[in-house]
């Protein structure tokens, strides 16, 4: 979650579009991201996934840049979910892998080992090589390429 906040803060003034779940956490993040001028589409793998993705696709085609957690709201960790594959194949947009790390942080005991940087921490953001999806590319091949690009820049 704080990952999105960093991206939204750094990219203020740009047309970012975040896909956020209907959970309590998703509601909090929606309010925070919206306060930074980021457009938010709600949906999740279990509730409103198709409608949310279609709305995300429509908005993306009007000039917004989608920001998506590739392993979704429930994981498993590091496993690229179908929504990102669908969006990338339908739009042809490049997927820019982004990862961050902090010198000091609190790590939650959650499925994704969620981290929050502590005050005074040095935060580094790493961008990987773009992954370009082909409209007719096999889903598993694309999933593997995205995961590899993310793992190449991820420090646990």
Stretches with model-predicted labels:
Residues 1-47, 91, 106-107:
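Catalytic core of membrane glycerolipid acyltransferases/transacylases, capturing the structured
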Residues 21, 44, 48, 72-76, ...:
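Alpha-helix N-cap/loop-to-helix boundary motif
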